[in-house]
């Protein structure tokens, strides 16, 4: 037995020596190995961390911790269970609002002509919301960075079910990202808005008895900051930005390169989810297929220069009988001619953007070539923003007062859009719009844009501090509808109707301002960009559906509620909760319905229809019986003066 075991051991040792390298071989192999430093593996770069966010029927899971904090703070677990789809809509919408800090909107616009920048996100948030974004950092690094994108099924998709519905979140650790992009964290609740107004000369005439709005009960500081508009023109917007790129080439094609896809069709399709929105982006991601189906696969061989079809053969079969009566088949292969390359279907590209020099040349053709310093005398500064400063100015030789916006043209990020809006404002004039008067370009950089000036300030001050009756509300709505009817007739959608953008003159004039969100659409067509201010926003925009001019009608109805209650619905809620409530409830509650006339209630009902196809238009509303109650505009004068005196 021992002899057998020792024999087996010797055999194993012998076989091991045969198949094992000798020491010399090992030394030789070690010499051929590269140095350890050359084999070092570098650290990963441009990594993307994917997190799947789902809803298990009880709560959302997988959200980065900053988003979980904001979700639990603003929306209770009961509300999350009640309507998880509305929570998803609110998260996606709120995430997009973190795109970039709010910038001055005056004369910085989404072009009302065809422009690839129109599909970016332009939703306003309060200054406090965006200011906190710079100061908050995520403790979990890139994996839970608020640059995480939250994606879910669109509003038209199936309802969420347990375990089967996921959002796709991603965060990038690219070191080239700016701090503002890395630190877009959901912000704390905004602070209450101020009710202060600039002081004007004391009014000494007899003022009729007013109905001041009763003070609000003490509330936690959750109100967004309203803009302080001392005059007509200083308002704000975010400047949209887009990235350009080209679709992948068609496989097997040697044709001309496909031109870049228009940016309003281009997306970052890094996930298979139906959308991909992030705190850095305020636009919905739409899946666009870039590949073309060519039927059969074509392979080429370079040895003989012949082209062969990989899935098709043309052959002639010939049957030949042999001596034994068996039949053999000889296949004679006929080489087909080279296949014709399928034509590449190219989308019609938009016109190329103008260069800065071309914009400057066109601007010189529009502006007044003379020197404005001899015509306008600057009196005081009434507004300042990222794009420029607004002044009140007197016109030399007259008593006219105008608003002058002065901008450093060379530093404007969207020069062509600025040029386009000047062209549009010059073309479309109406008594109920804050109209463009003229413009100047001094030393090829100092751009002056002269506009109407309304000393009465905006409607917000009046509706917050006083209480208008139905006749006065009808008068304001009638003037706004005249302006909207004019814009809609020219296929222009305002997209940001609210009391902040309605300016009042000391003689009772009512004018719409802030054309920064305007967009021109072809008759019958719709848009799907997300723009406006959330509290006044229509459900179809919030749910990122296609929309048309009916969005202005919804916002007008919300502004009517604002004149009744002193604030729009959900203003006391945090932005995320407000978006959730709009998505869940649709039509807001009319708190004082019992106190309103039947005509006013019917007017509100026609404006606040969730289905835009059933919503009234300007023609129908201008003929509505409620507007027959409109008082003369002079009835607004005592209220405007009283507010300006405080």
From Swiss-Prot:
Limits of the Protein kinase domain: 376-627
Outcome of substituting residue 405 to R: Probable loss of activity. Partial sensitivity to the heavy metal Cu(2+) and loss of kgb-1 phosphorylation upon Cu(2+) treatment. Does not affect interaction with mlk-1
A GO BP annotation: regulation of axonogenesis
Enzyme class of the recorded protein, top EC level: transferase
Low complexity: bias regions: 142-157, 167-180, 229-245, 273-307, 323-334
Location of the active site: 496
One GO molecular-function entry: mitogen-activated protein kinase kinase kinase binding
Pfam families: PBD, Pkinase
Polar residues compositional bias, start-end: 196-205
Keywords: ATP-binding, Cell projection, Cytoplasm, Differentiation, Gonadal differentiation, Kinase, Magnesium, Metal-binding, Neurogenesis, Nucleotide-binding, Serine/threonine-protein kinase, Stress response, Transferase
Record's catalysed reaction(s): L-seryl-[protein] + ATP = O-phospho-L-seryl-[protein] + ADP + H(+); L-threonyl-[protein] + ATP = O-phospho-L-threonyl-[protein] + ADP + H(+)
Ranges annotated as biased composition (Pro residues): 214-223, 246-262
Enzyme Commission number(s) of this protein: 2.7.11.1
Annotated segments matching region Disordered: 19-40, 136-345
Subunit structure of this chain's protein: Interacts with mlk-1; the interaction is independent of max-2 and mlk-1 kinase activities. Interacts with mig-2 (GTP-bound form).
Function statement: Serine/threonine-protein kinase, which phosphorylates mlk-1. Involved in the stress response to heavy metals by activating the mlk-1/mek-1/kgb-1 pathway. In ventral cord commissural motoneurons, required for dorsal axon guidance downstream of unc-6/netrin repulsion receptor unc-5 and probably of Rho GTPases ced-10 and mig-2. Plays a redundant role with mig-10 in orientating axonal growth of HSN neurons. Plays a redundant role with pak-1 in P neuroblast migration and in distal tip cell (DTC)-mediated guidance of gonad elongation probably downstream of Rho GTPases.
Name by which UniProt lists this protein: Serine/threonine-protein kinase max-2
Naturally occurring in which organism (per UniProt): Caenorhabditis elegans
Encoding gene per record: max-2
